[in-house]
Every structure is written in C-alpha cells, then in structure tokens.
Amino acid sequence: VTGVQTCALPICRSSTQEELTTTIIGQVLFIFILVMLFTSYLSLFRKDYFDKPRSITMLYAMITLFPIFVSLMMKHNFFSVYIIPFAMAPIFVRVFMDSRTAFISHVTMILICAAAVKYQYEFIIVQLVAGLVAIYSLRELSKRSQIFITALLVTIASSVVYLALQLMQDNQVFNVDASMYTYFTVNGIFLLLSYPLMYIIEKMFGFTSNVTLFELSNTNKGLLRNLSEIAPGTFQHSITVGNLAAEIANRIRANSLLVRTGALYHDIGKMTNPVFFTENQAGVNPHDQLSDLESAQIIISHVSEGLKMAEKVGLPGIIKDFITTHHGTGITKYFYINYCNAHPTEVIDKSQFQYPGPNPFTREQAILMMADTVEAASRSLNEYTEESISNLVNKLIDGQVADGFFKECPITFRDIALAKQVLIERLKAIYHTRISYPHLNVRQNAGKKTS
C-alpha cells in the first residue's frame, strides 16, 4: 500500500461514514413523517380507537413489526422480502376494525418497509395492490374458505402486477425473473396462516371476529341451549328481538351479526328466576305474593345475573355490554308507578327501581334497546292495527330519546327514524290479521248415491 493509498483510506472511511449517517437520518425523518401522518388520520377520522388501548397497540405493532422483518432480511441477505405476507396486516385490521384504517395502515407500513428495500417503486406497487385485494376480498370473514380465496387472489394479483411492471420496463417477456413467481406462491401459502394467527390476536387483544360471533350464535349449545330449556318464552323473545334488531342494523348499515348475537344473550339472566317474567308464566303470577319493591329488585337482578353467567363462560366483552345496556339506566315503570300510587305521601327513592346501566354507547346497543322494548310492549296491545302499532313504536322510542338513553352513542335521528320504520313494518308482518275460515256444515245426503 503506497503512502497516497494509506492517506486515502481514512478519507474513504470518513466519506462512507458520512453517507451512512446521512442515510440513517433521512430514513428516520421519513419514518417519523409517515407515523405522524398515520396518527393524524386516526385522530381526525377514528378518534374512538384512542379509547381502545388494545386497538392502538395492534395498529402500531403492525406498522412496526413488518419493517423490522424487512430490515433483518435485507441486512443478513435472507430470502427475498417478497415471501413476507404483508397482506396479513390489512387482513387483521380489516377483520377487527374497518376497511379504511386497514388501507391507510397498510400504505404506511409498506412505505416504511420501502425505505430498506431495493427497487422501491416495484415493491410499493406490488404490495399496495396485494393489500387492496386482501381488504376487498375479505369484507366479512364468516367461512374458512374465504382466507384461501383471499390468499389465491393476492398471489394472482401480485404476479400479474409484477409481470405488467416488468413488461413496461423491458418490453420482453423472456427477461422476467421467474423466481419471483415462486416467492409470490410462498407468500400466498404464508398468508393462509392468517386464520390460526387471527385466533391468537383475537385472544391477545380482546377482539371478537365474525367467526366467533357465528360460533356464539349457535343455539344448540351452551347458555343458549340452557335458555331454551329453562326459559323457553325468553328464548323465543330473544330470537324475535334478534331478528328485528338485525333488520334495523342492515337498514342503517350497522353490524347486524353483532347485534343479533348480542340479542340472543341479552336476557340470559332471566334463567335464575324464569317464572317471574311474563313470557315464561303459565297463568300464575308469583309477583302477586310480593311487594312492588321486591318484584322490582327481582326484575332488575336479571341484568347482574346475566353478567355473572356471561363472565363464568367467558363471553367476549362486546357481548356482555349488550347485557348491561339493554335497559340502560331506565326504571321498572310498572312496579314504580304501582308503588307511587300506593304510597302517595312517601318520598320515594327512585334508584331502588332503577337498572344499574350504563346507557347504550354503540349504535348496535341502541338498536337492541329499541327492538327489545318495542317487542316486549307489542304483546300487550289489545288490537294489532297499523295505527296501534305505529303509535306504540313512536311513543316508546320517542320516550327513550327524551329520557336521554342515546346521548352516549353515535346514533343519528335518521337512524332512529329508519329503526321506527323497520319495527312498524316487521310488527305488522308478525301480527298480521288472518282470514277467518268458514265452518263446514255436515251434509246429510253427502254419502248417498244419486240414481
């Protein structure tokens, strides 16, 4: 090594060090801007996620873990980064949260990963298309086959987009790197792991997927089977309420599967004292032997008893919320009014007749409260005409609005108006008038032959 070369070595090292430092600073700045933009999106459009620590944790974990995997693979020259199933992240966010957040988080994650990848333009385009296909092909996860179809579509879409990009650059089919299609196939196979991993994430972060809701709505096992045997009247009421609530949810674009499942479980606490509820009584009313205050306490207790049962079998929190909110902080009006009439001079503690609450804080919970109240009250009508049903529905729901039951949930007046419309339509169909068939008189000559 000559003297000139010896002097040049420190200069080369210094130049390389400066380039490396500059690159790192640029990457950190780039990532910081992307994370801030993603946080701004959440604070502007999905502020509710900040009230759910597990949701926020999962979102930031997704946009952090995948870039770490990419950096490690690039640093140690492992397999191609194209075998990493990046589309898995938007699948999880889509299933447990929403489509828009799934796409925004996916874009953020891919752009961060691109900072460590060669041929960034190609990588970004292929992965963005793969993510979009995954999101739109998996709108509602209700069957295992959907994951397989999604993995297949993502593999095909990635392969076609890569081929298109290569043709635009080289104009030669034969110059396309065939090994890339092997990577895309492996990527699709890894994407199938989304299904078992989904269960782990669900338990880890406390989410509830559609698959779990379908399993919980099976009426042939568990609490629902017990409900059908111990309190058959309540069971039928719950099914009817679930159908009404699901119809409303479909009309206002809420989660119909969630509200139907919640409706099936909302009255499970009645199994403790089934005969104290009118739908399970067979002529004898045990409340006749009790004071109004005692009766009110038994009726109110079905909420706390239902919550105990739900916790015992490990029902998800999102279902337990339907149990606690379906009466809100309302009162047992029948027994409260009776007590007031019987004790006109007494200063009455209203809280003794009041449900513990809380009031509904989601649209689905508000839907259940409306459907439950209307269905129960509809059975007390003397006649089922369009006018009587319409008056009942409007009176009950307007009363709930006036009492402030829906102040804590994001339901609109338009949603409530549509809910009324659905309830009136469905109750008219349930209690439609039937034709009275004529009585067939016995004909004396019916069996004789005529000559």
Task: Mark where each language-model region is.
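Short, small-residue-biased leader/transition segments that mark boundaries at the very start
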Residues: 2-9
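Residue-level signal for the membrane-embedded core of alpha-helical transmembrane segments
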Residues: 32-33, 188, 192, 365
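Generic detector of multi-pass transmembrane helix bundles and their immediately adjacent loops
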Residues: 43-235
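Divalent metal-dependent catalytic cores for phosphoryl transfer on phosphate-bearing substrates
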Residues: 222-386, 399-403
